[in-house]
């Protein structure tokens, strides 16, 4: 009997999801069973964990189970568990508001295109709300472990829900009654639903029972043993796939499956997956890791534990430890030596698998890198990472060969006498290919790696070498393409002579530009462009400085060096005029500097003056 009832409105965000569920065109609607079974299993896992320190919570009912029943006459599917249960506040928070960050990410990804948005349903998994794809009303009855009150939550998904106190006789746990839509009544077919439940339950460690058609006898559908505890030889590829999909709310198949039992000083079992598709929350501010920690088959936590490094947060799966005590507090897991050893072993194993894939399946590895390379490179900024091992699995775009290559491949293709790894960073690889910074290097068939992820500008400041080879930006002032492959005394002498010979030219540019530039030098790397900006070895890289300005970490850009190409016709003309004592090229000098700034993505100091100079030159050309 209902005692008191409150009517409430869903959060606006929940309303958006429910609207999509109710009008869903998603073809694989049966995932609602996956979501509800997974939630029921989680509820049992949570109570099993809490009962380790408070056995009264499971007094008289310590055998966890999930039951599924079809009531065809009333058009209902009933899912029942004896897990942790919910009180009134829990029902409001968990079912009336956005309680799961993954669901919030789902909302952010909605495009307004119904076809695309329906595809997102399968990629995200939206938990309980998926019920409304097949039901026009959902009734949830729940009693929280350790509490006496029973509460009933009910909604048709059309903007409002009710929460009621009830004096109904009800044991601990949660019961969900789905009132199935007429057009979805095929889900009331006993054999079809049994098949669906079985397909989603085989890996669940809680026994799942399905009532027969008469509604009297329970038939256990799953083995109720944790999948990772079984020998690999007894697990099919399909079982691995289904476990992965249930665990990660995914529709893709795993790219790599790692099922290992570690024996020795530290005993643990891991069943880990690398997805084949990019996860939507990879760069979410929460940066949550999706690997669950179990201790002796008891679920402990998947939050706020340092089980895997942040840069491997794309991993999905479970780790089950034999060495940690069951009664360990979550706070004690923060700096636990056993957990640290498990983390190191897993990291080593994952990097080993990636190295193997990179060598054996480069095309597959390129796809993986496009999805997760940005996250993986974050590890190069962390002090505790084995940077060289991580760099071994990194790949980058080659400017010379227009394909992804590793640092080891780059080194193997060094030109004779070359000892430095060159790179250029920017937002767009096509723009980088046309940059004057690398034209000289490429003309000598010296490769340049193109860095286009923001994280690249950070990790190169931490990792200046790889296997004793310097990693150097092509924007540096001291690059001499002639000396890159030869260190002869003769070329050093020629270089000094060149600087002295063009002193008249560099002084004129410096006098004209003043504080807009730090120094003006003769370039040893340009072959066709008139000029480019450059920075000294001690200075911050240009793109890194720009990023810090955007983030308001520093106030203003520093003055850059301007490098001139004496073989360029424009520079040659200015130099010849100077030798003839003609110093009337100030506007052209400013235009050359402005052009160098634009090519480097730097702001022009005076856009009005730049526009006037450009117009003047165009007018002279056509008159």
Swiss-Prot record:
Q: A Gene Ontology molecular-function term?
A: unfolded protein binding
Query: Per the record's keyword annotation, is Transcription regulation included, yes or no?
Result: no
Q: Which InterPro entries match?
A: HATPase_C_sf, Heat_shock_protein_90_CS, HSP90_C, Hsp90_fam, Hsp90_N, Ribosomal_Su5_D2-typ_SF
Q: Where is this region: Disordered?
A: 477-497
Quote the cellular component terms of the Gene Ontology held in the record.
Answer: cytoplasm
Q: Where is the composition biased (Basic and acidic residues)?
A: 488-497
* Span list, region B: 331-546
Localized where? Cytoplasm
What segment(s) does the record annotate as region A?
1-330
UniProt keyword list: ATP-binding, Chaperone, Cytoplasm, Nucleotide-binding, Stress response
Q: Does the keyword S-adenosyl-L-methionine apply?
A: no
Specify where the region named C lies, as residue ranges.
547-623
Q: What does this protein do?
A: Molecular chaperone. Has ATPase activity.
Please give the subunit comment from the record: Homodimer.
Say which family it is in: Belongs to the heat shock protein 90 family.
Protein name per the record: Chaperone protein HtpG
- State the species of origin: Rickettsia massiliae (strain Mtu5)
Give me the gene this protein comes from: htpG
């Amino acid at each position: 009997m209902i005692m008191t009832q409150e009517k409430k409105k869903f959060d606006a965000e929940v309303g958006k999801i429910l609207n999509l569920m109710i009008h869903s065109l998603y073809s694989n609607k049966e995932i609602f069973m996956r979501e509800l079974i997974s939630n029921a299993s989680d509820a049992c896992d949570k109570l099993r964990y809490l009962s380790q320190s408070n056995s009264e919570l499971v007094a008289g009912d310590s055998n966890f189970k999930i039951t599924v029943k079809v009531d065809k006459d009333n058009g209902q599917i009933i899912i029942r568990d004896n897990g942790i249960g919910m009180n009134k506040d829990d029902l409001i928070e968990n079912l009336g508001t956005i309680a799961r960050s993954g669901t919030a990410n789902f909302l952010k990804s909605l495009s307004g295109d119904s076809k695309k948005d329906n595809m997102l349903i399968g990629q995200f998994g939206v938990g309980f709300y998926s019920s409304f794809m097949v039901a026009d009303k959902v009734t949830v009855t729940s009693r929280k472990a350790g509490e006496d009150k029973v509460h009933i939550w009910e909604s048709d998904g059309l903007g409002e829900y009710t929460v009621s106190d009830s004096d109904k006789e009800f044991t601990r746990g949660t019961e969900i009654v789905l009132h199935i839509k007429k057009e979805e009544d095929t889900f009331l077919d006993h054999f079809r639903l049994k098949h669906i439940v079985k397909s989603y339950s085989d890996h669940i460690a809680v026994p799942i029972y399905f009532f027969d058609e008469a509604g009297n006898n329970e038939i256990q559908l799953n083995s109720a043993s944790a999948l990772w505890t079984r020998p690999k030889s007894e697990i099919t590829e399909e079982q691995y796939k289904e476990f992965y999909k249930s665990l990660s709310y995914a529709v893709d198949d795993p790219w790599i499956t790692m099922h290992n039992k570690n024996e020795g000083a530290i005993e643990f079992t891991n069943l880990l997956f690398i997805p084949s598709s990019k996860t939507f929350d990879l760069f979410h501010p929460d940066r949550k890791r999706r690997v669950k920690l179990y201790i002796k088959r008891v679920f402990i936590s998947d939050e706020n534990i340092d089980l895997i490094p942040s840069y491997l947060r794309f991993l999905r799966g479970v780790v089950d430890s034999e060495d940690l005590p069951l009664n360990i507090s979550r706070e004690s897991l923060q700096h636990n030596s056993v957990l640290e050893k498990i983390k190191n072993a897993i990291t080593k194993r994952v990097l080993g698998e990636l190295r193997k894939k990179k060598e054996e399946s480069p095309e597959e590895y390129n796809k993986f890198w496009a999805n997760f390379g940005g996250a993986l490179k974050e590890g190069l900024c962390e002090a505790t990472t084995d940077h060289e091992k991580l760099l071994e699995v990194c790949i980058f775009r080659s400017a010379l060969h227009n394909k992804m290559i590793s640092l080891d491949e780059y080194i193997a293709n060094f030109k004779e006498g070359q000892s430095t790894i060159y790179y250029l960073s920017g937002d767009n690889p096509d723009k980088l290919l046309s940059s004057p910074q690398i034209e000289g290097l490429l003309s000598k068939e010296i490769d340049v790696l193109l860095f286009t992820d923001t994280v690249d500008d950070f990790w190169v400041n931490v990792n200046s070498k790889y296997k004793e080879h310097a990693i150097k930006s092509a924007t540096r002032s001291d690059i001499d393409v002639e000396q890159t492959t030869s260190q002869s005394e003769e070329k050093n002498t020629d270089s000094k002579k060149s600087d002295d010979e063009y002193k008249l030219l560099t002084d004129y540019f410096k006098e004209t530009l003043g504080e807009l530039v730090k120094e003006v030098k003769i370039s040893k790397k340009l072959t066709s462009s008139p000029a480019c900006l450059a920075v000294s070895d001690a200075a911050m890289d240009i793109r890194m400085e720009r990023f810090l300005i955007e983030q308001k970490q520093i106030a203003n850009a520093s003055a850059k060096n301007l490098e001139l190409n004496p073989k360029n016709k424009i520079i040659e003309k200015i130099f010849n005029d100077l030798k003839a004592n003609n110093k009337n090229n100030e506007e052209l000098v400013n235009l050359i500097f402005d052009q160098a700034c634009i090519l480097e993505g730097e702001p022009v100091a005076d856009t009005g003056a730049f526009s006037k100079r450009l117009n003047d030159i165009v007018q002279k050309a056509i008159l």
